[in-house]
Amino acid sequence: MTDRSFSMVSGRRRGAGMLAAAGIAILGLAAPVTAVSTAVQVGVDPFSQATCAASGLTNHQANVEPDSFSNGATIVAAYQVGRIYDGGACAIGFSTSTNNGVNWTSGLLPSLTKYVAGGAWDRATDPAVAYDAQDNVWLISSLVLQEAGGVKGVAIYTSRSTDGGLTWGTPILTNNTSISPDKNWIVCDNTATSPFYGNCYTEWDDNGAGNRMEMSTSTDGGLTWGAATTNNTGIIGGQPVVAPNGTVIVPTANANETAIGAFNSTDGGATWSAVTTIATIRHHTVAGGLREGPLPSAEIDGSGVVYVAWTDCRFIRGCKANDIVFSKSNNATGTAWSAVTHIPIDGISSGIDHFIPGLAVNKATSGGAAQIGLTYYFSPRKSTALSVGFTSSADAGATWSAPQTITSGMSSSWAATTSQGRMVGDYISSSYGSDNLAHGIFGAANQPTTGAATSCSTSALDNCRAPIDTFTPGIASGSLSGANDPILFSGTGGSAAQNLWNIVDNEGIKHRD
């Protein structure tokens, strides 16, 4: 995964200008009034070629791939800092707000990489954030990489904060038995009436074993982790969520990123079900040499309905551009799902490409009144310029607000360069605060400042201009109906579909570290 800076800003309507600086952005939006705000920087890349020059080309002033989680008025985000060309970053950064995004405290996770406070590892990547209500502890899961013998993932670690996400302790080893772990994610059971209240679950795939799914469980606030368990399926990009009754549901892509499915545990992580296919994927390659794929973004409402969004071109004639589509669970175990529905950001004949969704669902809402927020990237027709947009729904996805442009006019060449293309992140994130606004976090960028450099490249490695920013929450306006969208698939699995989930021969062909 790459690093890029992030900024949080409230939504603007289409046509808004670029952010003042590249970065990671968080926004807060919902219907029906419009609000606009300016970007505020919440995190930086403190490194340079002199202080972090890994074995591969290293981008600086370049933070990428954010995740976030919220509890009450506290929002914690984590992201890569100093993205390295052939995998991972110099460090994992964090930004924490205790007042719904008004003020932020930022820093680097200690003792993870050799560039920060005595860490042992060469690189780190794939940060994911969770909160454990039983133990009142914040958790950030990270994948660490080593360079010797070729860059590869070697272990999953969990960093813990017991003071509301403001400072972080020495990371705890979660697992180091996989051949080459990738794409980790973390979640905790925060429902006091759940039989597994306080359980936390970390998911990843073992790229060195055909992208085999692995899960580990902690029952003590992330201090110790159990042995990995598996259902022997090939996956990538799983995002576990926990229902109020303690059932863990894990939406995921298959190892080849050609299908979206879900599996579950109803016994606190002791065993995991086979995968139910939600839908096959149709995907359009995004312009501009951008690193991007149809990985899922998943969340859950207050009653246990799971929502999963991904990039898909099935509704576009000739598959010439991508939409953001979604499906939601129709039963308590995630083994039945609604038809795939197009989110009506733009008309299906607009030619506008939409990709890398960051989905939020307000857990204080449920049923037909579930509130959904969606942050996403888009590129205008026949353009490689990147923009970031936001839309929301106050009725469980039946209708959606008019889209707002948060930032626009970013050249893909300003993004960090990696072996899999220019990168803003394999995923971005949105989280609802206690203000009932969806705070989205994403990477943004301006032109590098070194000499005549026009891209984040070998001539501008220390000046990629991608800091971490935030924005004051805003509110989206308007309403667009999705009721007449065509429906192509309503999957409930089946024996033929299970072939999609076979472990890939030899090493998995998809890895995103």
Pin down the residues of each PLM region.
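Secretory targeting and sorting signals
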Residues: 4-35
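C-terminal PAP-associated
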Residues: 33-513
